C-alpha cells in the first residue's frame, strides 16, 4: 500500500518556526517583506503563477510579514526586461524589502541571467543568483543555505519520511533552472545516481521504469500542450518506486489544475507518492518562508553568507 508523502506537517512546523523569528525581528524594528515580480503574460503561465503567488503571499502574511506584488506582465514586451531591471535595482536598495521573488518561468524574450545577476544575493529568496548557485554547487547545507525552494522542499520531505537517496537510481524529468537542474546537482551531492531527462531525451519511459525514485518536474500536461506534452503514468514506473510530482498548470478557461503525475495509476505501484494537492506545493511554500526569514536576517545584519547566522 502506498505511503503518501504529504507536506502539511512540514508546512505547519516551518510557519510556526518562522513566527517565532518574526517576533524576534520585531525587537529590531524589522518586518519580513517579500516583493514578487510577475513577468509572464502567457495565459496558462499567468493563471498558474497567480495561484502560486496568492498562496505564497498568504503564508508570508500569516507569519506577520508583508507582501508586495508587481504586475510587470502589463508592460509591453519590448520594455518589460528594462522595467524589471530598474525595479530590481530599486528593491535591492529598499530598506524595507527583505526578500525578492522573480516568479518563474519567465517569457522567452527576457534574459533570465541578466535579472538574477542584478538581484542582490542577500534578498534572493529562490536561491537563483550566481552567488547562491555557486554555494549550492560547492556543497549545500539543507538547513542553513538559501536554496531553490522546490528542490529543498523535496529533500526536506525525504528526510521527514526517511526516504533514502544515497546509492539509489534517481530519474529527474525536467532540467529547468528552478527545479530539475538544481535538484539533480543536490541529489548527486547526496550520492544518488542521477539521470536527468528533458524534451530531447529519447524514450523517457525507458529510464523512469528502471528508477528507484522518479521526480517529475515538467509542467506540460496533455490537456494544455500539444507540443511535447508529458504525464507520468503507472505503466511508466517499476513496482515499489518512490514518485514525486512537481509540475502542474492551470487552465485559464476552466480554472482547473492539471498535473505531471497520474495519481491513481501511479499509486497502485509506488511505495511512496506525493499527492498532487498537499504534497510538494506545501513543501515549496514552507521553504520560501524559511528563505525569507534567512534573507531578512541577512539584510538586518548585512552578512554575506547565511552560514554566518545562528538561527
From Swiss-Prot:
Which BP terms in the Gene Ontology apply to this protein? L-histidine biosynthetic process; methionine biosynthetic process; purine nucleotide biosynthetic process; tetrahydrofolate interconversion
| Highest taxon, organism lineage | Archaea
Q: Which GO terms describe its molecular function?
A: methenyltetrahydrofolate cyclohydrolase activity; methylenetetrahydrofolate dehydrogenase (NADP+) activity
What is this enzyme's EC? 1.5.1.5, 3.5.4.9
Give the pathway listed in the UniProt entry for this protein: One-carbon metabolism; tetrahydrofolate interconversion
Q: Where are the transmembrane segments?
A: none
User: Which Gene Ontology cellular-component terms appear in the entry?
Assistant: cytosol
- Residues annotated as binding NADP(+) are 174-176
Q: Which SUPFAM superfamilies match?
A: Aminoacid dehydrogenase-like, N-terminal domain, NAD(P)-binding Rossmann-fold domains
Check the record and name the InterPro entries matching this protein. Aminoacid_DH-like_N_sf, NAD(P)-bd_dom_sf, THF_DH/CycHdrlase, THF_DH/CycHdrlase_cat_dom, THF_DH/CycHdrlase_NAD-bd_dom
Any idea which UniProt keywords this protein has? Amino-acid biosynthesis, Histidine biosynthesis, Hydrolase, Methionine biosynthesis, Multifunctional enzyme, NADP, One-carbon metabolism, Oxidoreductase, Purine biosynthesis
The catalysed reaction is:
(6R)-5,10-methylene-5,6,7,8-tetrahydrofolate + NADP(+) = (6R)-5,10-methenyltetrahydrofolate + NADPH; (6R)-5,10-methenyltetrahydrofolate + H2O = (6R)-10-formyltetrahydrofolate + H(+)
Question: What does the subunit comment say?
Answer: Homodimer.
Q: Which family does it belong to?
A: Belongs to the tetrahydrofolate dehydrogenase/cyclohydrolase family.
The record describes the protein's role as: Catalyzes the oxidation of 5,10-methylenetetrahydrofolate to 5,10-methenyltetrahydrofolate and then the hydrolysis of 5,10-methenyltetrahydrofolate to 10-formyltetrahydrofolate.
In terms of PANTHER family, this protein maps to: C-1-TETRAHYDROFOLATE SYNTHASE, CYTOPLASMIC (PTHR48099:SF5), C-1-TETRAHYDROFOLATE SYNTHASE, CYTOPLASMIC-RELATED (PTHR48099)
Q: What is the recorded name of this protein?
A: Bifunctional protein FolD
Q: Which organism is it from?
A: Pyrobaculum neutrophilum (strain DSM 2338 / JCM 9278 / NBRC 100436 / V24Sta)
Q: Per UniProt, what is the name of the gene that codes for the protein in this document?
A: folD
